Amino acid sequence: MFNCAVTAIDLTPMPLLSTDNMTTAPLSLSTDTSLIEKSLFGIPEWLLQINDDISRALERGVNIRQLVSARACVIDDLLIGLFKWFELDKTDLALFATGGYGRGELSLHSDIDILLLMPHEIDADTSSKIDNLVALLWDIGLEPALSVRSVSECLEAALDHTIASALLEARLLIGNETLQDVPHQIVNNQWSPRAFYDVKIDEAKARYLQHNATEYNLEPNIKTAPGGLRDIHIVGWVTKRYFRVSKLYDLVQQNFLTEKEFDELSFSEGYLWQIRHYLHELTGRNENKLLFDYQREIAQLMGYDTQPDDQPNAAVERFMRDYYRCAMQISTLSEMLTNHYYETIIEPQLPDEERPKKQPINARFNQVGEQIAMAHHRVFAQHPESILEMFLLMGQYGIKNVRTHTLRALKIAARGIDQAYRDNPTHQTLFLANLKEQNYLFHRLRTMNRYGVLGNYIPAFAQVTGLMQYDLFHRYTVDAHTLFLIRILHRFIDPHFYEDFPLVSSIFQRIERKEILVLAAMFHDIAKGRGGNHSQLGEIESIEFCLAHGMSNADANLVGWLTRYHLLMSMTAQKKDISDPEVVTLFADLVGNVTHLNHLYVLTVADMNATNPQLWNSWRATLMKQLYSQTRRILRADIDAPTNRQDMISATRKQALMMLDNVDNQHMNRDEVLSLWDDLGDEYFLREIAEDILWHTEAILNHPPIGRASNADSPPLVVLREHRELALDAVQVFVYTQDQVNLFAVTMAVFDQMNLDVLDARIITATRDFALDSYVLLDRSGTLLVDSDSQQELKQRLIDAFKNPTAPKLTHKRIPRQLKHFDVETTINFEFNDASSQHIMSLETLDQPGLLARVGQVFLQQQIEVHAARITTLGERAEDMFYISDQNDQALSANKLKTLKTALIESLSVHNDSI
């Protein structure tokens, strides 16, 4: 039984209900509820007051461990009192606390798991009393998770490993003391150590997959996610089954757990309990998911104050960094300790043929089955270089894992990596050799990171461990993102992934010094969180590291250049018009040579894939490939390649004609095709690819009277097709109609009304004032691709809107929950394009429902003509570009630009304030 220490924590005494007042006969709720209500008056309010007392005690600095134990004791006393009230203590029943409550751990709104155990079948009278007890518990607001079982029923139920886990935590509160050890005996009878270990490990693996197998989710579940409380519980479950202990600290006395490991687990558990307390307090329920809704407030409650020089998100980012570090420590210890249990308890009991065989690698290391192990316990102390040598051997021998006694020694040895260690030429050679060895590189670096080797060898890497940017775009911490990037680089030499990355894979396989890219990956984000330009700061740090490790100036400078310009290619491809030869030429000038281009292309594709799983798609892949190919032609001075505007137009027309000749084109006359193309204008062939040109051409020519004689009375043409290569629910929409001033605004309003997100937009005006608008959309409802009625509705809505071009009607939708917690300042900039006499307007603002419809409405009000748009959504940020002019295709005046900017900011600000 726990010591509640009520006086020390100053909890409010229980009102009226006490065992001293229970001398009268127990009352049935169904016969005399008035006396019961009088006796139990105030208990719901008392329970709320207890929660308030606990919260105030936490504010005063009382240890959270005391508080979760104190609340468990309070509930103990209440349940014991009620058990007596209903005279259940005069039966053969035993009342057990199980699960977390059995461990004596209750947060404000934790589940109260209880078991009523009977040696035989429960009679009707006892069953009635139990029903009354349960009803009362619900009436006073406890909402218990109650199981009522006989011993035989419990035996059968324990075949479910989740119930067996709860029984392992069973703690007798009151009742039949002869049943005190029965729950544990049942588990021991029903489960062998090996079977129970296997099922709990399988459960943990399944649980990890539900949370993307990472500790670094943006809104982590602090109970069930990797690195959550469940990872501590699993250590207790598998070990308690064997050692028959009740507390985690008992494992220290069993020499299974070291004092330091216990302290680390205990501290991390307390940190999560504190977060959990505030989650329960803020939500008023058993909430374990650390949503954006609560992260800022919990950071403040836990003392993460914003400093005068801080960025707006600094405090919450510090809080989440500490959470992620805590989660990584828990998951690492949990994995190590469960493996240690297998190696020391399960493995020795296996038949000889199933036990891993030991084979010497050298004087310092052995291979034990599929693991590496030090040959004796003094290896790291006597041979410090063996820390890095071990990881190199793992790559050379194809060994993925490390024995736990070696991991324990490694963790201690890693603390001794200091500047003298880093300056040792032998150690430097071994570290670079590790990066050159591609076999299991990700897994080796991951182990280095988790056990302190990487952070001590590269101190700057330790600074970004657990560092998360508070946004929806960056899905992982900097260290996790960096290691994922290196993992993706390795996939470029894996035949299984060649189909996903054909061009990148072929380029990467031709690069001889692959460690150049690995080093660039290691350093590309290493200066985040310091303030200033992280790319430039990282360049300096990477060059210093490479030179200190004996690399040539050329190699060091290439690593530095890649670190500095790692965002250049993705930003150019996504934010600029790469159909413009001047844009590509400027990019080529910055890149300088094909070697730089090849390395940058590979690094950029890997970086985008490792940043956010939703970021990479065939649309972005096409943009990147297009920019790479065009730049490579310029850098190679390919005289046959189109390098100027007219050459690119001619090349696209030629490619489209070749495709036309290779398909069934009986519905298209070649002369009519060429005549139509002459009407479409040069801009069209600069911006569209040959495949889409062929699709558009066939649609136009087979839609009379547009195809043969376009005129002002021609009906609008709207055609759709799926674009699954881009995304599962992607739809391509092509519009060909008489140009009009509000076409963009009307189109965006219709898309918004039908819950369609715009990924890309190309707005082109043909020579005869016909608009050729092409859009790539994402269907939020997922029905447009499969529902012909929805397709027809979209077509008809657009056609009706084009025929009746009144001011578009905007919808008012609630902003998604996650977006509400981000403050993105709206910024608008203009750049004049001499070649087109148009302004390029860049808009950065909070992504929100109906954003483009609102922008289109402002364009309509300000009499702005849209010629092209590039739509980019990066998490919570919308970063869009529009090529605009006045309605006479003339450049906008300075006053007009100022008015437009003011109108846009005002429109978007009003909308943001209202949702």
Swiss-Prot record:
Q: Where is this region: Uridylyltransferase?
A: 1-360
EC no. given is 2.7.7.59, 3.1.4.-
Reaction(s) catalysed by this chain's protein: [protein-PII]-L-tyrosine + UTP = [protein-PII]-uridylyl-L-tyrosine + diphosphate; [protein-PII]-uridylyl-L-tyrosine + H2O = [protein-PII]-L-tyrosine + UMP + H(+)
Instruction: State the residue spans of region: Uridylyl-removing.
Output: 361-731
Q: Which residues form a coiled coil?
A: none
Q: Which residues form the ACT domain?
A: 732-817, 840-915
* Protein name stated in the entry: Bifunctional uridylyltransferase/uridylyl-removing enzyme
Gene Ontology biological-process annotations: regulation of nitrogen utilization
Name the HAMAP family for this protein: PII_uridylyl_transf
Q: What does this protein do?
A: Modifies, by uridylylation and deuridylylation, the PII regulatory proteins (GlnB and homologs), in response to the nitrogen status of the cell that GlnD senses through the glutamine level. Under low glutamine levels, catalyzes the conversion of the PII proteins and UTP to PII-UMP and PPi, while under higher glutamine levels, GlnD hydrolyzes PII-UMP to PII and UMP (deuridylylation). Thus, controls uridylylation state and activity of the PII proteins, and plays an important role in the regulation of nitrogen assimilation and metabolism.
**Per its Swiss-Prot or TrEMBL entry, what cofactor is needed?**
Mg(2+)
> Which species?
Psychrobacter arcticus (strain DSM 17307 / VKM B-2377 / 273-4)
- Activity regulation here? Uridylyltransferase (UTase) activity is inhibited by glutamine, while glutamine activates uridylyl-removing (UR) activity.
Per the record, the similarity remark reads: Belongs to the GlnD family.
